[in-house]
């Protein structure tokens, strides 16, 4: 039946900041849905607090609210916009939980808003573990297959301890209700572990409910993606098999689509169970994902869980099959049925045809354990990966090897040279699942392990183990051959070996292997993803490489621009860079170019087949990019390759591309070197007469000590050429400097360590600007709230700046122009300054799109990334002003006085990591970046904007209750005024003895509490950590002492994370929070859409 006519406007809830377990895939699905709903003529209202997303661009929805996703704020938006319906299934767990709580509070009923896409009953049946158990039992009664693991529901610690007895002892699995990414879940092997995991699970579950179940470790794990409409048509979009057996969260496992090791009968059985479940739960206007465990010994099937919403797996399934689940879910939600929706890719077949694949897809996760040295790297049922890469091949080995090299991590590809090591040790290592387990398995095979031994140790299915043996046999053949002949080379390529691996095995250079390969005529062809195994013609060019016979790349007339994406998400290089690539693609298509996107990240908008004219789903290595350029050169004219938008990954390829004769447009490789290389950049600054903090480079401890002695401590030490501040540290004395140099393994004359003077108490400033060779456009000036020394990606910042005057902006503009000119930038540049005393120091310059571009663009209502792409291809700022792509006059440095103030706050993944003893990871910020995402708060005054940013990132600031203060000596003076403000707002202050003394002398009363190290008092007085755990503290201010992680502070901050109490670790954040608390208690906090803000800014500019 056709579209419903009673719905005129829809509110879509996004997923908020990127956290582990809920990443860019929801931006992809939300963007798809908003476009579809608007195309259907509905008014779309969107709420999402994350500015780095495409979906929060003003052109995607009719009214875009960058506001915290909390029931209070969403209610304000509903009251203002009065939508007819609410679609909550595209924003992950955040959106689902918000919608459910608004339904329960009666808000939806009060304003007459209908929930579409999933009804409350279906959501509860899918999410509530007890109800879902009932669903599985009902299905078993009907079709005779499928069961749940034996389990017990618990609401308290006593229930939990009894439950273990019922299930027959340890190990048991703990799973909380209504959480995502496996938060709070885990395997408990004894009582101590059980108390820890279940205690955290009860806290995290919004319904204080956990499920204990029998352990099914080592079983095979599968997933099905299904869709159902209200006429009861069901399609199975895709089957996915996990390479790792049960016990590793599916988001952390290598996964394969379609599933490889199921017999036809087993697959039909899973299908039958899946279809029966989606009917029983009652999902009738959308998609869902169901996870199964199969016992390899007797084939017993257990249904683990389902998600009645668009999930991480559905983004993967969409990219793997070309079947756009989110788009179709949005159409089903407004009344269409599957047989009425055409398949975009073939245009001939309806969405009720199930996709069939004539290729294999492998997804590999990307981790960031190097950022949290104390974290436990064992993989469990709690998701820990921060990103993923996907690859497509004609067989499993090709897809697997391509996926591993797409991860761009040292040591992620299989290596076949050097001694493998001891077989017994390697097999023992492979028992514990970690992010490098597949490499340990390969080394064990090289050391002589048998397939049976590998299976015993890892429980990885024998078929997969056999495939690993196949790869190893080919490597042996490559090593033993007299010379590389075309047959052997082609065979190696068909199994996914890269030129780098072949060169390593043969003891040659990569470029020599490539020359031989080209001379022998061994080159890849490109195949199309067409959803139907080539039964119908595909209308959308979505390619993957393979060493096959015929190429499917069609010739074209228009000049092509190849945009290199940013690869898998990781800390320091996330969705913000994808945002710039997508914008470039839109802008260049409009300007008449054929846009070609190269990327391997399945979560993103850039790898959607309708973002660019052609999409290559390929690894971002030199070899793969050169082959794509070659294929596109044969198809028609190539204007050039853009490397400045995808972060550090494509930037690192620019020189090599140029050396291979590929035109790099925009900022040339020489300019990138001038900004990245310390010596060259120092020269640019010297010529422009700009001060930088005193610095030097060293390759030994003696050299570093000499520099530090001359500059004076504290110093900032870091390796060269890194993104996200990897390996940076503030060093306060000589002994720590010595151990830092000793721990840094990668020091060499070509990669020295940089030693800078560290500016204490300086204001850090970030500038994003455009330069076309003649004119500078200042995009925005951001003032950091935390002091210099905290990585800019982790610091909160305000735009327009809140304490800088007109004169300061003039100086910033002149310095930025001098640097852009001196470096030779064409397009975007990001510069970090520090203001200490009255001197403006230059910290560093990045000749590329930075992670603040989306935030700056939204705060000033100017599409910077679009403008940068046009400048790369020769447009001038004057021309873009004439086209109104940039404002006709003024720029981000001359914003009107009543411009709204935007605050960006970083979101950290502390709660996901534990060390091996189960303790938390310390939450102190430093020069190494650790945040996974960001939120934005926007309002007419700073206090409210800051309060909104905190509510969006960590939950609302408290407006009453007890505040605990304990600060380092250097912070005691600056803490007095904010502390007095807190008392004025009616807070009761708690403090440790030293801080309480200073407060008392200044006339502020504070109750003294005991430190953790002092233990309980004689009368049973609790320590501060116990008070926090008992929920008796509402706000914590705790600044660390030097770099020594004094245990007191560590214990306090870890307790704060466990109980979700706001914890401020700098005095600057405290001062901002006080302004926020003030704004919350005095004013009525309103909401305005980005479109209203933009209208206001444009009117003021003209």
From Swiss-Prot:
Residue span(s) of domain MGS-like: 955-1100
Positions that bind Mn(2+) 2: 305, 307
Record: residues binding Mn(2+) 3: 832, 844
Residues where Mg(2+) 3 binds: 832, 844
Binding site for Mg(2+) 1: 291, 305
GO molecular function annotation: ATP binding; carbamoyl-phosphate synthase (ammonia) activity; carbamoyl-phosphate synthase (glutamine-hydrolyzing) activity; metal ion binding
EC number(s) recorded for this UniProt protein: 6.3.4.16, 6.3.5.5
Record pathway: Amino-acid biosynthesis; L-arginine biosynthesis; carbamoyl phosphate from bicarbonate: step 1/1; Pyrimidine metabolism; UMP biosynthesis via de novo pathway; (S)-dihydroorotate from bicarbonate: step 1/3
Biological processes per GO annotation: 'de novo' UMP biosynthetic process; glutamine metabolic process; L-arginine biosynthetic process
Any one cellular-component term (Gene Ontology): cytoplasm
CDD domains, sorted: MGS_CPS_II
Cofactor(s) required, per the database record: Mg(2+); Mn(2+)
Sequence positions that bind ATP 2: 718, 757, 759, 764, 789-792, 832, 844
ATP-grasp domain sequence ranges: 138-334, 682-873
Annotated segments matching region Carboxyphosphate synthetic domain: 1-408
Any Pfam family the entry gives: CPSase_L_D2
Binding site for Mn(2+) 1: 291, 305
Record region (Oligomerization domain): 409-551
Keyword Repeat attached: yes
Residue ranges of the region described as Allosteric domain: 955-1102
Key word Transcription present: no
Domain notes: The large subunit is composed of 2 ATP-grasp domains that are involved in binding the 2 ATP molecules needed for carbamoyl phosphate synthesis. The N-terminal ATP-grasp domain (referred to as the carboxyphosphate synthetic component) catalyzes the ATP-dependent phosphorylation of hydrogencarbonate to carboxyphosphate and the subsequent nucleophilic attack by ammonia to form a carbamate intermediate.
Protein family membership: Belongs to the CarB family.
Record-given protein name: Carbamoyl phosphate synthase large chain
Organism in which the protein naturally occurs: Streptomyces avermitilis (strain ATCC 31267 / DSM 46492 / JCM 5070 / NBRC 14893 / NCIMB 12804 / NRRL 8165 / MA-4680)
């Amino acid at each position: 039946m056709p579209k419903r006519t009673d719905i005129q406007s829809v509110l879509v809830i996004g997923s908020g900041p990127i956290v582990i377990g809920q990443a860019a895939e929801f931006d992809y699905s939300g963007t798809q849905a908003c476009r579809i709903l608007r195309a259907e003529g509905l008014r779309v209202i969107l709420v999402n607090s994350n500015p780095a997303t495409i979906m929060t661009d003003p052109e995607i929805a009719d009214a875009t609210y960058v506001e915290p996703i909390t029931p209070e704020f969403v209610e304000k938006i509903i009251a203002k916009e009065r939508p007819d319906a609410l679609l909550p299934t595209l924003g992950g767990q955040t959106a689902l939980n918000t919608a459910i709580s608004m339904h329960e509070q009666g808000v939806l009923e009060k304003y007459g808003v209908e929930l579409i896409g999933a009804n409350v009953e279906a959501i509860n049946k899918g999410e509530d573990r007890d109800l879902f158990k009932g669903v599985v039992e009902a299905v078993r009664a009907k079709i005779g297959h499928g069961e749940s693991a034996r389990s017990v529901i618990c609401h308290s610690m006593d229930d939990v301890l009894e439950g273990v007895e019922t299930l027959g002892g340890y190990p048991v699995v703990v799973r909380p209700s209504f959480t995502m990414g496996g938060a709070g879940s885990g395997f408990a092997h004894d009582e101590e572990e059980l108390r820890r995991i279940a205690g955290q699970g009860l806290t995290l579950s919004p319904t204080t409910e956990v499920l204990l179940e029998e352990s099914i470790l080592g079983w095979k794990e599968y997933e099905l993606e299904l869709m159902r409409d209200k006429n009861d048509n069901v399609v199975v979009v895709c089957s996915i098999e996990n390479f790792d057996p049960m016990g590793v969260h599916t988001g952390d496992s290598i996964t394969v689509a379609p599933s490889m090791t199921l017999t036809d009968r087993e697959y039909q059985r899973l299908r039958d169970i899946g279809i029966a479940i989606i009917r029983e739960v009652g999902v009738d206007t959308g998609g869902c994902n169901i996870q199964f465990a199969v016992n390899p010994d007797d084939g017993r099937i257990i249904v683990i869980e389902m998600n009645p919403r668009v999930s991480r797996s559905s983004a993967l399934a969409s990219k793997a099959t070309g079947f756009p689940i989110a788009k179709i879910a949005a159409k089903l939600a407004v009344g269409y049925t599957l047989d009425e929706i055409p398949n975009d890719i073939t245009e001939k077949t309806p969405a009720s045809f199930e996709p069939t694949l004539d290729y294999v897809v492998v997804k590999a996760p990307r981790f960031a354990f190097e950022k949290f040295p104390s974290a436990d790297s064992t993989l469990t049922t709690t998701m820990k990966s921060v990103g993923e890469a996907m690859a497509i091949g004609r067989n499993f080995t090709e897809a697997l090897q391509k996926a591993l090299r797409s991860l761009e991590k040292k040591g992620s590809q299989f290596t076949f040279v050097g001694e493998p090591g001891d077989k017994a040790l390697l097999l023992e290592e492979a028992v514990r699942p970690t992010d490098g387990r597949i490499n340990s398995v390969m080394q064990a095979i090289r050391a002589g392990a048998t397939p049976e031994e590998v299976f015993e140790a890892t429980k990885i299915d024998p078929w997969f183990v056999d495939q690993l043996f196949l790869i190893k046999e080919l490597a042996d053949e490559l090593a033993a051959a007299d010379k590389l002949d075309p047959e052997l080379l082609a065979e190696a390529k068909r199994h996914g070996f890269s030129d780098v691996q072949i060169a390593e095995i043969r003891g040659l250079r990569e470029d020599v292997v490539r020359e031989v390969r080209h001379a022998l005529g061994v080159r890849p062809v490109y195949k199309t993803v067409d959803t139907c195994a080539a039964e119908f013609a595909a209308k959308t060019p979505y390619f993957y490489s393979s060493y096959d016979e015929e190429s499917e790349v069609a010739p074209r007339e228009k000049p092509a621009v190849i945009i290199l994406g940013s690869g898998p998400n990781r800390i320091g290089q996330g969705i913000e860079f994808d945002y710039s690539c997508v914008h470039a693609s839109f802008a260049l298509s409009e300007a008449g170019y054929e846009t070609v996107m190269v990327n391997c990240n399945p979560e993103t908008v850039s790898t959607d087949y309708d973002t660019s004219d052609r999409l290559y789903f390929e690894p971002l290595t030199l070899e793969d990019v050169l082959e794509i350029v070659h294929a596109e050169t044969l198809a028609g004219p190539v204007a050039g390759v853009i490397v400045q938008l995808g972060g550090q990954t494509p930037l690192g390829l620019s020189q090599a591309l140029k050396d291979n004769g590929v035109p790099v447009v925009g900022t040339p490789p020489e300019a990138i070197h001038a900004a990245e290389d310390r010596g060259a950049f120092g020269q640019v600054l010297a010529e422009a007469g700009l001060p930088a903090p005193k610095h030097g480079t060293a390759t030994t401890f003696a050299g570093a000590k000499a520099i530090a002695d001359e500059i004076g401590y504290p110093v900032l030490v870091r390796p060269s050429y890194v993104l996200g501040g990897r390996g940076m540290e503030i060093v306060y004395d000589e002994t720590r400097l010595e151990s830092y140099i000793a721990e840094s393994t990668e020091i060499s004359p070509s990669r020295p360590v940089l030693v800078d003077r560290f500016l204490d108490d300086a204001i850090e400033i970030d500038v994003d600007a455009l330069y076309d060779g003649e004119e500078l456009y200042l995009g925005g000036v951001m003032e950091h709230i935390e002091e210099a020394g905290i990585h800019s990606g982790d610091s909160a910042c305000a735009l327009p700046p809140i304490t800088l005057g007109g004169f300061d902006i003039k100086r910033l503009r002149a310095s930025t122009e001098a640097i852009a000119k001196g470096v030779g930038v064409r397009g975007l540049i990001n510069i970090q300054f520090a203001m200490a005393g009255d001197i403006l120091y230059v910290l560093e310059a990045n000749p590329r799109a930075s992670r603040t571009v989306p935030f700056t663009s939204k705060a000033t209502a100017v599409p910077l990334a679009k403008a940068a792409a046009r400048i790369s291809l020769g447009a001038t700022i004057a021309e873009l002003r004439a086209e109104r792509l940039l404002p006709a006059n003024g720029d981000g440095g001359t914003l009107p006085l009543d411009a709204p103030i935007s605050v960006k706050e970083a979101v950290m993944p502390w709660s996901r990591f534990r060390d091996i003893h189960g303790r938390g990871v310390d939450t102190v910020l430093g020069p190494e970046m650790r945040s996974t995402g960001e939120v934005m708060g926007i309002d007419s005054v700073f206090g409210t904007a800051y309060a909104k940013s905190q509510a969006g990132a960590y939950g609302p600031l408290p407006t009453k209750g007890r505040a605990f203060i304990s600060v380092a000596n250097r912070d005691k003076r600056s803490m007095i005024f904010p502390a007095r403000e807190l008392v004025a707002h009616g807070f009761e202050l708690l403090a440790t003895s030293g801080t309480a003394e200073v407060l008392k002398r200044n006339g502020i009363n504070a109750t003294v509490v005991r430190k953790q190290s002092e233990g309980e008092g004689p009368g049973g007085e609790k320590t501060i950590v116990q008070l926090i755990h008992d929920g008796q503290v509402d706000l914590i201010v705790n600044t660390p002492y030097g770099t020594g992680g004094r245990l007191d502070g560590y214990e306090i901050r870890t307790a704060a994370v466990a109980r979700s109490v706001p914890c401020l670790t700098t005095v600057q954040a405290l001062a901002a929070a006080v302004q926020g608390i003030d704004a919350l208690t005095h004013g009525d906090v309103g909401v305005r859409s980005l479109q209203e803000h933009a209208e206001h800014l444009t009117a003021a500019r003209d």
